[in-house]
């Protein structure tokens, strides 16, 4: 097998010229995975054949669509375990016919999890919760759910397992979200030592709970004066990093902290949001001792997400970056700054008063005077 593999890797690039004189470059290669499975590598493309078979748990969430899209357009077969029929429909068109496979599963059903991973050579676990519900607690999702997925990965000897955790993951944290995320990391590493751990900072994008939350009229009550500090990261950058980890086996057994280039407080981001939407959102600061129990009651009494006691606790924890963890720099990625994307993601929140604002620049004033006679 070794001489054959070496011969395939050394195959020269084939250049084909058509009748019009244009050159079409065809590159083919064979990669042998850790378990000896041959993977046909090519230039990629939506309709290309070969490539990896990847299972993406949590693909229907904010981060999931970005990694599914990147894998599918490279010719990979993507298996998407889902719970809700309506939440997964938009993912079907991210890949060519037959490249995106949907499998219904239950996080408490080991058989459905094993069915989702048994044909794959890479598994992504993006499952997580920002708040507990009556059906799933933080421990159910971040620890027990991750444990079942890791056991299925180990049972079928999957080549790569990439587990997405969270920034500030600490088993001794007073915040249950951070504590369960850290214990989940320990569990998956004990079952599958070659697990790649990814800890993204608070992410911003089209479906985020950062920019859109600050732009919403419902986000009124805070407890720490919005003074918590963190490095917000673009969700597209995180998706690109997850894709590159698949192609680079040196990322196995490593821990990555993925965060943006600048540190902001929530108050600073809120000011950027207000400037972008031409509105002033009101925020009322309530002491932690009062707001935390109220948030806990609302989380249990209402069936739609408003706030939870753990989210209030999270406001008092600044982001702490692990100096020993690898970052975007080790993947050759330059993370984007949130200040460059506020208009892109928040333009739909703009007030109609925007159209009545006076010209802002001298050029706009000249154009305004030029066409004023048409009004």
UniProtKB/Swiss-Prot annotation:
<dbReference type="InterPro" id="IPR036291">
    <property type="entry name" value="NAD(P)-bd_dom_sf"/>
</dbReference>
<dbReference type="InterPro" id="IPR051207">
    <property type="entry name" value="ComplexI_NDUFA9_subunit"/>
</dbReference>
<dbReference type="InterPro" id="IPR008030">
    <property type="entry name" value="NmrA-like"/>
</dbReference>
<keyword id="KW-0809">Transit peptide</keyword>
<keyword id="KW-0813">Transport</keyword>
<dbReference type="Pfam" id="PF05368">
    <property type="entry name" value="NmrA"/>
</dbReference>
<dbReference type="GO" id="GO:0006744">
    <property type="term" value="P:ubiquinone biosynthetic process"/>
</dbReference>
<feature type="transit peptide" description="Mitochondrion">
    <location>
        <begin position="1"/>
        <end position="26"/>
    </location>
</feature>
<comment type="similarity">
    <text>Belongs to the complex I NDUFA9 subunit family.</text>
</comment>
<dbReference type="GO" id="GO:0005739">
    <property type="term" value="C:mitochondrion"/>
</dbReference>
<keyword id="KW-0274">FAD</keyword>
<protein>
    <recommendedName>
        <fullName>NADH-ubiquinone oxidoreductase 40 kDa subunit, mitochondrial</fullName>
    </recommendedName>
</protein>
<dbReference type="GO" id="GO:0044877">
    <property type="term" value="F:protein-containing complex binding"/>
</dbReference>
<dbReference type="GO" id="GO:0005759">
    <property type="term" value="C:mitochondrial matrix"/>
</dbReference>
<keyword id="KW-0496">Mitochondrion</keyword>
<keyword id="KW-0249">Electron transport</keyword>
<keyword id="KW-0679">Respiratory chain</keyword>
<keyword id="KW-0285">Flavoprotein</keyword>
<comment type="subunit">
    <text>Complex I is composed of about 40 different subunits.</text>
</comment>
<comment type="function">
    <text>Accessory subunit of the mitochondrial membrane respiratory chain NADH dehydrogenase (Complex I), that is believed not to be involved in catalysis. Complex I functions in the transfer of electrons from NADH to the respiratory chain. The immediate electron acceptor for the enzyme is believed to be ubiquinone.</text>
</comment>
């Amino acid at each position: 097998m070794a001489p054959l593999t070496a011969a395939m890797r050394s195959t020269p690039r084939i250049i084909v010229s058509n009748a019009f004189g244009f050159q079409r470059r065809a590159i083919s290669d064979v990669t042998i995975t850790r378990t000896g499975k041959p993977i046909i590598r090519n230039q990629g493309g939506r309709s290309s054949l070969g490539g990896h078979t990847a299972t993406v748990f949590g693909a229907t969430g904010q981060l999931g669509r970005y990694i599914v899209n990147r894998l599918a357009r490279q010719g990979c077969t993507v298996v998407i375990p889902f719970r809700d029929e309506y939440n997964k429909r938009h993912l079907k068109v991210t890949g060519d016919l037959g490249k995106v496979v949907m499998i219904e599963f239950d996080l408490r059903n080991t058989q459905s999890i094993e069915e989702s991973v048994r044909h794959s050579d890479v598994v992504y676990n993006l499952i997580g919760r920002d708040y507990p519900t009556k059906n799933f607690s933080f421990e159910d999702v971040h620890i027990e759910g991750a444990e079942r997925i890791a056991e299925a990965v180990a049972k079928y000897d999957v080549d790569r397992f990439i587990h997405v955790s969270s920034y500030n993951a600490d088993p001794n944290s007073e915040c249950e979200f951070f504590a369960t995320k850290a214990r989940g990391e320990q569990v998956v590493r004990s079952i599958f030592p070659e697990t790649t751990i990814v800890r993204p900072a608070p992410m911003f994008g089209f479906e985020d709970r950062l920019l859109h939350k600050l732009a919403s009229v419902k986000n009124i009550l805070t407890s720490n004066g919005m003074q918590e500090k963190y490095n917000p990261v673009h969700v597209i950058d995180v998706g690109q990093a997850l894709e590159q980890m698949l192609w680079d086996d040196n990322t196995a057994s490593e821990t990555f902290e993925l965060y943006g280039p600048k540190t902001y407080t929530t108050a600073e981001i809120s000011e950027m949001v207000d400037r972008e939407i031409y509105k002033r959102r009101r925020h009322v600061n309530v002491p932690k001792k009062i707001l935390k129990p109220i948030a806990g009651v609302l989380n249990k009494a209402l069936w739609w997400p408003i706030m939870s006691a753990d989210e209030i606790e999270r406001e008092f924890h600044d982001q702490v970056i692990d100096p020993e963890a690898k970052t975007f720099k080790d993947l050759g990625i330059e993370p984007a700054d949130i200040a460059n994307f506020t208009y892109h993601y928040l333009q739909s929140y703009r007030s109609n008063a925007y159209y009545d604002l006076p010209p802002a620049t001298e050029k706009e004033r000249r154009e305004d005077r030029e066409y004023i006679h048409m009004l």
